[in-house]
Amino acid sequence: MSTEIQTELHQAVELRRNFAIISHPDAGKTTLTEKLLLYGGAIHEAGAVKARRAQRKATSDWMAMEQQRGISITSTVLQFEYQNCQINLLDTPGHQDFSEDTYRTLAAADNAVMLIDVAKGLEPQTRKLFEVCKLRGLPIFTFINKLDRPGREPLELLDEIEQELGLQTYAVNWPIGMGDRFKGVFDRHKQQIHLFERSAHGSKEARDTTVELGDPRIEELLEEDLYYQLKNDLELLEGVGPELDLDLVHQGKMTPVFFGSAMTNFGVELFLKYFLDYALKPGVHISSVGEVPPTYPEFSGFVFKLQANMDPKHRDRVAFIRVCTGKFEKDMTVNHARTGKIVRLSRPQKLFAQERESIDVAYPGDVIGLNNPGVFAIGDTIYTGQKLEYEGIPYFSPELFATLRNPNPSKFKQFQKGISELREEGAVQIMYSNDEAKRDPIMAAVGQLQFEVVQFRLQNEYGVETILELLPYSVARWVEGGWEALNKVGRIFNTTTVKDSMNRPVLLFRNEWNCQQLQGDHPELKLSAIAPVFSSQTVE
């Protein structure tokens, strides 16, 4: 590798940060996302989703159904710069039905920000997504939100994180007051108090007054009880809390904790500054040829998301690629690991929610959008140089099933196209009956809202009205060894056999008990709750 390329890659990696936000619905994730963009200069005024004023729609919620309902239901990539760093924010769906899309997004992230509502603490969806982050070994940064409202004691929340998630905590800053009396935060590293001034509904950057801890003005600026509460809390933290250990943070064993209010912008910029200092830069990825560092000179990346109709005017399809190694250049030709084909990557785009602009180069940690004329599938690896392939992205086991009918024969082509494209982008899993007379697709989902999204998008983007009929199943299991293994067993009971989009056998059960009964009757039949990951090479 030439010295120039090595230096270029090293500098690019040093200046990149990549993260996803995980939270329970309504913890304020879309609001925090907007405020980070506000401080990054990517937008000039934040528009809260739930605000009843005539503010504009939230930047990250771009799909028609998201803007109607005020919830995030598809992951979005938002890229912006702050203090010379290139930041890739992978905005994930907040709704619990969309854990599959979130999982795929976390596969492309280097860090995770866990957002917690100060009044509610840890909630079910947060715990579930934390487990995914833990499996991937992601560093987790915690932002405790909504301090402008009444909530639980900060020390109680730290204890809950430690006890329930097994994470050590280190409070990087500490709140002064709460609810109507929330005045600001104390920066433990710099020993400074930041007192905030409210901006117009939080749509502009918050102004703050910074005061050193020993400054005699503190007692004038703070009410007496808040000042003494702060002193007592800090003494307790220094006495019993651990020191910040970035090695433990990067191993996912300690979480730096920040307090603030995304709605009013209090504490958001402080969080962003420390995040850039503490977060992992783009690192090594496990591949079929072992660990590959980001400064490896050959280009490689993987597809973690597909999205149809991001621009309804053009009926386009975009593949989201996480760059892992080397330098991406416009019009370069790459190898497509799954098919062995050579693909020319023309018209690459920098993504910003629904908006896009052309780019010429990209580096490890970046996410680029490529027009996808049916070439890419989720989990695909593209590369130059020596053949390599990254680990695939598995599917979650669905729990809800329904047949989807198109009552209008004249819309057959649009129906087939819509189902195919929505399946490819992972909006829902599609299965088919083994009975050739039953041609209607079977949708398989993690939650009910996925069905609603598919029906809405088929009508909104493809002009097809559909009829949904729920099926009485709640458990799906893939057969290891495929049709050959299943046929050896012979006739089986209390299950329905279907095939997935890759023609692999899947057994559907009404309940977990029926599934366990089958496994007891046929121990030779190996069943899996996760679809086998297709890969032309195994990972060493």
Curated annotation (Swiss-Prot):
GO CC, alphabetical: cytosol
Residues reported in the UniProt entry to bind GTP: 23-30, 91-95, 145-148
Sorted UniProt keywords: Cytoplasm, GTP-binding, Nucleotide-binding, Protein biosynthesis
Q: Tell me where it resides.
A: Cytoplasm
Note whether Nucleotide-binding occurs among the keywords: yes
Q: Which InterPro entries match?
A: EF-G-like_DII, EFG_III/V, G_TR_CS, P-loop_NTPase, PrfC, RF3_C, RF3_dom_3_sf, RF3_GTP-bd
SUPFAM superfamilies, A to Z: EF-G C-terminal domain-like (SSF54980), P-loop containing nucleoside triphosphate hydrolases (SSF52540), Translation proteins (SSF50447)
Top-rank taxon: Bacteria
- Please give the chief subcellular localization of this protein: cytoplasm
NCBIfam families xrefs: prfC (TIGR00503), PRK00741.1 (NF001964), small_GTP (TIGR00231)
Q: What's the protein called, per UniProt?
A: Peptide chain release factor 3
Which species is the source of this protein?
Nostoc sp. (strain PCC 7120 / SAG 25.82 / UTEX 2576)
